[in-house]
């Protein structure tokens, strides 16, 4: 088992009808994942407060697609890939990115 995170980036606004269908589709996806024996830890991100590009200029908000949600879970690599591929988000203008993650190393004790 490894730690994984799904990152969701919104690229467009969805209609009220799409929102209803998306809720049903995501509920079905959650059930599929639970049936695989995987527990999900979902998080929603609010609007960007500040984004500082590499060149150092500060901007309010973010002009590109917005990182809107992320879901953390533990699974095998094959399960993680299947979980990402099954997610309905792309049908609603949301990209899905799968990454493995590790916890930061503990700080060295101070002398």
PLM region spans:
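Conserved, structured core segments of small domains
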Residues: 1-111
């Amino acid at each position: 088992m490894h730690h994984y995170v799904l990152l969701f980036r919104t690229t467009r606004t969805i209609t009220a009808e799409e929102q209803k269908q998306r809720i049903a589709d995501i509920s079905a996806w959650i059930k599929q994942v639970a049936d695989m024996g995987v527990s999900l830890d979902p998080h929603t991100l609010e609007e960007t407060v500040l984004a500082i590009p590499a060149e150092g200029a500060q901007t309010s908000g973010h002009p590109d697609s917005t990182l809107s949600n992320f879901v953390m879970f533990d699974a095998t690599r094959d399960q993680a890939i299947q979980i990402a591929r099954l997610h309905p988000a792309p049908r609603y203008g949301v990209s899905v990115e799968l990454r493995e993650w590790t916890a930061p190393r503990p700080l060295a004790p101070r002398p």
